[in-house]
Amino acid sequence: MDASAEQSLPEPGSQDSVAGDDIEIVVNVGGVRQVLYGDLLSQYPETRLAELINCLAGGYDTIFSLCDDYDPGKREFYFDRDPDAFKCVIEVYYFGEVHMKKGICPICFKNEMDFWKVDLKFLDDCCKSHLSEKREELEEIARRVQLILDDLGVDAAEGRWRRCQKCVWKFLEKPESSCPARVVAVLSFLLILVSSVVMCMGTIPELQVVDSEGNRVEHPTLENVETACIGWFTLEYLLRLFSSPNKLHFALSFMNIVDVLAILPFYVSLTLTHLGARMMELTNVQQAVQALRIMRIARIFKLARHSSGLQTLTYALKRSFKELGLLLMYLAVGIFVFSALGYTMEQSHPETLFKSIPQSFWWAIITMTTVGYGDIYPKTTLGKLNAAISFLCGVIAIALPIHPIINNFVRYYNKQRVLETAAKHELELMELNSSSAESKPGGSRSDLDTLPPEPAAREGPSWGSRLKLSHSDTFIPLLTEEKHHRTRLQSCK
C-alpha cells in the first residue's frame, strides 16, 4: 500500500471510521493475517471481533483495550494468541458452530473462546466431550495435589489431638509417606492372605478336630491364627475410623463396609456361641454360626485396598455397565429361546432329559456360556442342531463386549498413571517456585506476591487465566489459592 493510500485511511474516532457492514479489517493473530468484513462479524455483536468494528468509532484507548497492538495505516489489529485456535474460533462466523482441531489442548481452546468472547454453546457436541474429559482430569489432578498438600501441611494452630489424628491417618492411608507406613501396609496385605488361607484350610477334614459334643471343628491353631488376624483387622479399622476427617463418609464407603463385613462375623459368631452354650440351644446357634462364617469370604475383597489393578478393574466394569447389560439381555433372550426350542425338540425322544422349559434353562445357560456341564444334553438330531446354534450364539454374545471392557480398563489404567505423574510434576513446580522465591535477595516475596490482589477465588480448580499479565497469557493454574499452597510447601521443607 503506497503513502497516499495510507493517508486516505480514516483515524479512529473520525466519521469515516464508523462501523459499517462494508468495513474491512485485518486481524493478525500470532503472525497469521486474516481479512474479515463487518457484515460477517456483525452476526455476533457480543464477540471481540465484532467489538473491533465498533471500536473504530472510538479512540485508541478503546482499541488497545481489545487488542495488543494496532496499525492505523493498515487498519490491522495484532493479537499474541494461538493462530491455530483462532482459525477454529472464526468458524462460528461462517458456519455457526466451532470445531476443535485435533492436537489442541481443550482447556487452552476454551480459554481462547473466552478471550474471543465466543460462547461455549457454539462448540459442537463432539468437541464438548473432550473438554469435559479434560476438565475432569484437571479436577482429579487438583484433588490429588490438594490431598498431598493437606498431608504435607502442618498447621501450628491445630491442637495436639488433631495433629495426632492427621499423623495416624497419613500413616494408615498413605503407605508411600514413610518406610514404617509401607511396612504396615505390606503386613496388612500379608495378613489378609493368611486369614484367607486359614479360612480355606479350616474346611479340610484332615485338619479338623472333634470337640466334646462330637462335632468336627477347626483346629485350635488355625482358630488362634484367625483370631490374631481379626484382632489386627479390628485395630486397623478402629484406628482409621478414629483418625478419619469425615467419619460418616468413612463408614459409608464401599471398602470400609467390606472391612466391617470381614470382621463382624467373627464377633457375632463368638457371641452366638457363648449365648447358645448358656441357653443349651447349640443346634440352632451352630447353624447361624455356619451361615455367618460364609461372610468371611468378604475379607478377600480387602485386597482391593492394596491393589490399584483391582480398583482399576472395578472402575472399568462400572464404566462398561451398558456393555454388560447388553450382554445379559442378549443371553437372557437366547436362554429363553433355546431352552424352549430344546424342550420342544426333545419331547419326541422317550428318554428325554428336558422335563420342562424352566428345567431347560440350566442347559441353555451352560451351553451358551460354553461350559458344557453334561448333566443335561440333547439326544435328537434337531436337539443337537439347536445346541450347536445356541453354542455359537453364546460365543458371539460373550466376545462382543470383551473389547470395550478391555479398552476401558487400559484407558483408565493409563489415565491413572498420567494423573499421578501430573500431580507429582505440579508439586515439583510449586516447590521450584517456592525455592526460587526464597533465593531472591530481600526476602522470599516473588513477583507473584507483588501483583494486585485477586478477587475472592471460588472453590475448586480454576480453569481461566488467573494471572492476567497480558492478553496472550495462557497460564492454567490447577489450584486457585497459589500463595497459600506455596507458603505451605515452604513450611514443610
From Swiss-Prot:
| GO-annotated molecular function | potassium channel regulator activity; voltage-gated potassium channel activity
Q: Which residues lie on this side of the membrane: Extracellular?
A: 205-223, 271-289, 346-357, 379-385
Q: In what tissue types does this protein appear?
A: Expressed in brain namely in the piriform cortex, olfactory tubercle, and medial habenular nucleus. Also expressed in the medial amygdaloid nuclei and the lateral amygdaloid area.
Keywords for this protein: Cell membrane, Ion channel, Ion transport, Membrane, Potassium, Potassium channel, Potassium transport, Transmembrane, Transmembrane helix, Transport, Voltage-gated channel
Kindly indicate where the leader peptide sits in this chain: none
Q: What positions belong to coiled-coil segments?
A: none
The transmembrane residues are: 184-204, 224-244, 250-270, 290-310, 325-345, 386-406
Q: Which GO terms describe its cellular component?
A: ciliary base; membrane; voltage-gated potassium channel complex
Keyword Transmembrane helix appears in the UniProt entry: yes
Give the ranges annotated as intramembrane: 358-378
Query: Where does the record place the region Disordered?
Result: 433-468
Cytoplasmic-side positions: 1-183, 245-249, 311-324, 407-493
Query: What are the GO BP annotations of this UniProt entry?
Result: action potential; non-motile cilium assembly; potassium ion transmembrane transport; potassium ion transport; protein homooligomerization; regulation of potassium ion transport
Which compartments is it annotated to reside in? Cell membrane
Q: How does it sit in the bilayer? A: Multi-pass membrane protein
InterPro entries given for it? Answer: Ion_trans_dom, K_chnl_volt-dep_Kv, K_chnl_volt-dep_Kv5/Kv9, KCNF1-like_BTB_POZ, SKP1/BTB/POZ_sf, T1-type_BTB, VG_K_chnl, Volt_channel_dom_sf
What family does this belong to? Belongs to the potassium channel family. F (TC 1.A.1.2) subfamily. Kv5.1/KCNF1 sub-subfamily.
Any idea what job this protein has? Regulatory alpha-subunit of the voltage-gated potassium (Kv) channel which, when coassembled with KCNB1 or KCNB2, can modulate their expression and their gating kinetics by acting on deactivation upon repolarization and inactivation during maintained depolarization. Accelerates inactivation but has relatively little effect on deactivation. Coexpression with KCNB1 or KCNB2 markedly slows inactivation.
Quaternary organization: Heterotetramer with KCNB1 or KCNB2.
Q: What is this protein called?
A: Voltage-gated potassium channel regulatory subunit KCNF1
Q: Which gene produces this protein?
A: Kcnf1
